[in-house]
C-alpha cells in the first residue's frame, strides 16, 4: 500500500521519505516488523517505542512513524500524535471497515457488557442480523467467540477485528467503549450510528486525575455519534451531555423521560416493568434480577429504537434473552438449600447495586464475598468495605487480583471503611478459603454473592494470572464436603 494512502487524514509535521513508496505491513511492536514494513513508535506510559527504532531498522523497516525527531539516517514521518496516527493508519490499512457497518458504542462504568450482549440478542432476533461484538468478556463475530484481554482492543487490532466482521458479513458491530480507549485514541477514526451512556461511578481514578476528567473523557463519545441513549437518573447526566453533538434519547427508571419505566417489579428470577415512550406503553420482562437490569433494559430498548426497531419488537426479543455470564449468575449447588451467585461487581456502585437487589428478595441471610483489585484506584477500597458490611448480613473480605500489591495491605484498606459498630465481617485473604468459609456457614435460604470476578477465570498475583474459576471452586468444594 502506498505510504500516502496509509497516512491519509494524519497531520504530518516533517518527513524525509517519498510518499509514493510502497509499504508492505504495519507494526507498533518492533519484534513484529518485517522487511519493507512500517514501524509506528508509540510513546507509552511505561515504555517509549522510540527506543526500539534501531531494532525495527535492523528488521527491515522501510519507514518509521513517530511523534519525535528520530536519529539521522532513519527514514521517518513525524506526526503530531503517534496514538492518533496508529488509529488512522489502521483505518486506512484495513479499508475503513467501520464505514461498512452500523457501529454502536456503549460507555459507562457499569452495565456495558450486559447492554452490549442484550442488544446483540435483540438485533439477531428481530433483524436476523449477523452482529459483531467487542467487549470485556469476549469479542464475537456472529456466534464465533474470540478471547479478549481488554475492554477495547488497541486501535490497530480493533480495525483488524472490524475488518474481520465486515468480511464475515456483519451488518452491525457493537462495542464497549472504555474511557481508556477514548483517552488513548483506540477508537479514533470511528463514527457511531448509536452511542449509549449507562452510568458513571468511581473507577479508574488511577488513570484519570479526577471524576470530572473521567466523565469528560467518556463524554467525547457523544461527539462521534449520530444518536445516543443517556441515563437521565445518573448524577453526571448534565456534564455528560453538555457538549453532545448527536440526538439524545433520555431514559429513566425514576420518572418521566424520553423512554421510561413504570410499574417496576423486582423479582427473584428477573424484572418486569412497563416501558413508556410517548403514547406507547409496552410490557417488558427480562429473566435477569436486579434494579440495574431495568436500566440495562431501558438502554437496550432505546438503542434498538434508534436502530429502527419498534419498541414492541425489542421488548419481545428481550423476553427471550438469557442471563449474562458473571452477571448475577446462579451457580449450581445440588443438594443444598442455599444459593450462590457470581457477579462482576468491582466498583462501589456495582457492589451496592448487586447486594441491594439481592437483599430485596433474599429470604435468609445475605453473605457477601468481595475484595478490591491491586494496582488500581485505592480510593474505592474503604468505600466498598462500608457498602459490603452495611448491606450484607455477613461479609467475607478477601483478595481480588492483587497484582503486584500485597493482598493484606489491600484488605486493610477495605476494612478501614467499615463502620466502627459493625462486627459482621471476617477477613480471609485467600479467596478460595473465603469462598469455602461462606459455603460452610450458609444456611437454608441464604444467598452467597461472590463479587468481583464475574466472567474472569483467573487470579492475578505478582503479574502472573493463575487459573481460578469460581464455578469450579464451588462445585469441587461441594463434591469434597459431600464425600
Region annotations inferred by a language model:
Residues 1-14, 35-38, 84, 124, ...:
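ATP-dependent carboxylate-amine ligase
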Residues 1-88, 257-265, 281-283, 289, ...:
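N-terminal leader/targeting and accessory segments in enzymes
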Residues 3, 9, 66, 70-73, ...:
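Acidic, Mg2+-coordinating active-site environments of NTP-dependent enzymes
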Residues 49-62, 76-85, 193-199, 216-218, ...:
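A short, gly/pro- and small-residue-rich
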Residues 68-70, 136-137, 179, 200, ...:
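Short, ordered loop/turn segments at secondary-structure junctions
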Residues 72-73, 140-145, 202-207, 376, ...:
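A short acidic, helix-capping loop that chelates divalent metal ions and anchors anionic groups
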Amino acid at each position: 500500500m502506498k505510504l500516502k494512502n496509509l497516512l491519509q487524514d494524519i497531520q504530518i509535521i516533517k518527513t524525509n521519505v517519498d510518499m509514493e513508496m510502497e509499504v508492505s505491513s504495519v507494526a507498533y511492536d518492533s519484534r513484529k516488523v518485517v522487511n519493507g514494513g512500517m514501524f509506528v513508535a508509540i510513546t507509552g506510559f511505561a515504555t517509549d517505542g522510540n527506543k526500539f527504532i534501531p531494532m525495527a531498522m535492523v528488521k527491515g523497516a522501510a519507514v518509521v512513524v513517530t511523534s519525535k525527531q528520530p536519529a539521522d539516517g532513519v527514514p521517518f514521518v513525524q506526526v503530531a500524535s503517534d496514538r492518533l496516527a496508529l488509529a488512522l493508519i489502521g483505518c486506512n490499512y484495513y479499508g475503513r471497515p467501520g464505514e461498512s457497518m452500523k457501529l454502536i458504542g456503549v460507555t459507562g462504568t457499569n452495565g456495558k457488557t450486559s447492554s452490549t450482549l442484550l442488544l446483540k440478542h435483540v438485533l439477531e432476533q428481530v433483524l436476523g442480523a449477523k452482529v459483531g461484538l467487542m467487549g470485556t468478556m469476549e469479542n464475537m463475530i456472529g456466534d464465533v467467540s474470540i478471547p479478549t484481554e481488554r475492554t477495547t482492543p488497541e486501535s490497530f487490532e480493533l480495525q483488524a477485528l472490524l475488518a474481520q466482521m465486515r468480511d464475515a458479513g456483519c451488518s452491525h458491530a457493537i462495542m464497549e467503549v472504555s474511557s481508556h480507549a477514548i483517552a488513548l485514541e483506540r477508537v479514533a477514526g470511528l463514527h457511531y450510528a448509536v452511542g449509549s451512556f449507562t452510568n458513571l461511578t468511581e473507577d479508574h481514578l488511577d488513570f484519570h486525575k479526577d471524576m470530572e476528567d473521567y466523565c469528560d473523557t467518556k463524554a467525547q463519545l457523544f461527539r462521534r455519534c449520530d444518536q445516543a441513549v443517556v441515563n437521565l437518573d445518573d448524577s453526571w447526566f448534565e456534564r455528560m451531555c453538555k457538549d453532545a453533538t448527536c440526538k439524545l434519547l433520555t431514559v429513566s427508571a425514576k420518572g418521566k423521560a424520553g423512554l421510561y419505566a413504570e410499574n417496576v417489579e423486582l423479582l427473584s428470577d428477573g424484572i418486569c416493568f412497563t416501558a413508556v415512550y410517548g403514547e406507547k406503553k409496552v410490557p417488558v420482562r427480562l429473566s435477569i434480577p436486579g434494579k440495574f437490569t431495568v436500566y440495562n433494559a431501558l438502554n437496550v430498548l432505546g438503542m434498538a429504537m434508534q436502530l429502527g426497531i419498534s419498541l414492541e419488537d425489542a421488548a419481545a426479543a428481550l423476553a427471550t434473552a438469557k442471563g449474562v455470564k458473571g452477571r448475577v449468575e446462579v451457580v449450581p449447588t445440588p443438594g443444598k438449600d442455599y444459593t450462590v451467585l457470581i457477579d462482576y461487581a468491582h466498583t462501589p456502585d456495582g457492589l451496592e447495586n448487586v447486594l441491594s437487589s439481592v437483599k430485596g428478595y433474599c429470604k435468609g441471610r445475605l453473605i457477601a464475598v468481595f475484595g478490591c483489585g491491586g494496582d488500581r484506584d485505592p480510593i474505592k477500597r474503604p468505600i466498598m468495605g462500608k457498602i459490603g458490611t452495611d448491606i450484607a448480613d455477613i461479609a467475607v473480605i478477601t483478595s481480588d487480583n492483587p497484582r503486584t500489591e500485597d493482598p493484606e495491605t489491600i484488605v486493610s484498606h477495605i476494612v478501614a471503611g467499615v463502620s466502627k459498630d459493625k462486627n459482621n465481617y471476617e477477613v480471609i485473604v485467600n479467596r478460595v478459603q473465603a469462598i469455602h468459609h461462606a459455603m460452610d456457614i450458609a444456611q437454608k435460604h441464604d444467598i452467597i454473592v461472590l463479587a468481583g470476578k464475574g466472567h474472569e477465570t483467573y487470579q492475578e498475583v505478582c503479574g502472573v494470572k493463575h487459573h481460578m474459576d469460581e464455578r469450579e471452586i464451588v462445585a469441587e468444594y461441594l463434591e469434597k464436603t459431600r464425600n
